[in-house]
Amino acid sequence: MSAFRIVIPARFASSRLPGKPLADIAGKPMIVRVLERVQDAGAAEVWVATDHDGVREAVEAAGGKVVMTRADHPSGTDRLAEVACALGWQDEDIVVNVQGDEPLIDPAIITAVAAELAADGEAAIATAAHPIHDADEVFNPNVVKVVCDARQRALYFSRAPIPWARDAWAQPGERAVLPAGLPVLRHVGLYAYRVSFLRRYTALAPAPIEQWEALEQLRAMWHGYRIRVLGLQAAPAAGVDTVEDLERVRAVFAGAA
C-alpha cells in the first residue's frame, strides 16, 4: 500500500486522569510509550499533536516530532485537520489517528486500518470493529456499536443495541442472552482519514444525530461520506482512562521488563 502517516493527539487536560500523557509507565511518560509502540506500524512519519509544553518537551527528549495545536478544538478530527494543514500534506495522503492513551496498541491494527482505506477509493475514513459476545456490552450505552453493509462500510454507529433482535428480545427478561449469530460489532476508536476529507470536515455543519448520540463520526455519515470498517477477530488492548487502567498497564510493562 502507499505510505501513510500517524498523528497521536495528546491532550494534557484529561477530566478523569489529569496529566495523563505524562503519567509514568516503567520509567517513561505514557506518550513516549505510545510513540515507541507505533514505530512498528510502518508509517512514513509519526507526529504527536499537543497543546502542552510539558508533553512537547517529553516527546522531543525521546527523539519524537511534535506539532503544537490549538487548545480549543471541539473534536480530535478538528485537531488532526489542523496538523494536516500545518504540515502541508497532500489531499491523497492517508493519516491514522492513534489515541495518546493506548500504550499497548497493536501496530498491526494501525497498518491494517490504513490499508483498508487505501483499498477503498470511495471511502473517506476507515476504522475497526470486533464482535461482541456479552449482552451487557450490547446494552451498555458507553459501548459504541456499528452495523455494516456487504462491502464492510458502516451503515450506522450507535450507543443503542444495533442490530435489534426483534423476536429474541420481544420481552425485557429475554435480553440477558445474545441470540446465536446476531452480528453485533463493537466500534474501536481508531481512524484513518484521507487528507482531502479532513480539509472539508471542519466546514461541515454538526449533524443532529451526531449531537444526540455524541459520536463525531456520524457527522461524516450525515453529510454522505463513506466509512470503511476493518473487522477484527477480537478486542484490541484497552486504553487508559482511569487510575485503575493506568495501574493495569504499568503491571503489563513491569512484567515485560
From Swiss-Prot:
Q: Which terms in the Gene Ontology molecular function aspect does this entry carry?
A: 3-deoxy-manno-octulosonate cytidylyltransferase activity
Q: In which pathway does it act?
A: Nucleotide-sugar biosynthesis; CMP-3-deoxy-D-manno-octulosonate biosynthesis; CMP-3-deoxy-D-manno-octulosonate from 3-deoxy-D-manno-octulosonate and CTP: step 1/1; Bacterial outer membrane biogenesis; lipopolysaccharide biosynthesis
Leader sequence segment: none
Q: Which reaction does it catalyse?
A: 3-deoxy-alpha-D-manno-oct-2-ulosonate + CTP = CMP-3-deoxy-beta-D-manno-octulosonate + diphosphate
Q: Which GO terms describe its cellular component?
A: cytosol
Q: Which keywords does this chain's UniProt record carry?
A: Cytoplasm, Lipopolysaccharide biosynthesis, Nucleotidyltransferase, Transferase
Q: Which SUPFAM superfamilies match?
A: Nucleotide-diphospho-sugar transferases
**Primary place of residence?**
cytoplasm
Localized where?
Cytoplasm
Give the InterPro entries listed for this entry. Answer: Cytidylyl_trans, KdsB, Nucleotide-diphossugar_trans
Superkingdom: Bacteria
Question: What EC identifiers does the entry list?
Answer: 2.7.7.38
GO biological process assignments: CMP-keto-3-deoxy-D-manno-octulosonic acid biosynthetic process; lipopolysaccharide biosynthetic process
Entry function = Activates KDO (a required 8-carbon sugar) for incorporation into bacterial lipopolysaccharide in Gram-negative bacteria.
Q: Which HAMAP family match?
A: KdsB
Family, as annotated: Belongs to the KdsB family.
What name goes with this protein? 3-deoxy-manno-octulosonate cytidylyltransferase
Which species does the entry assign this protein to? Azoarcus sp. (strain BH72)
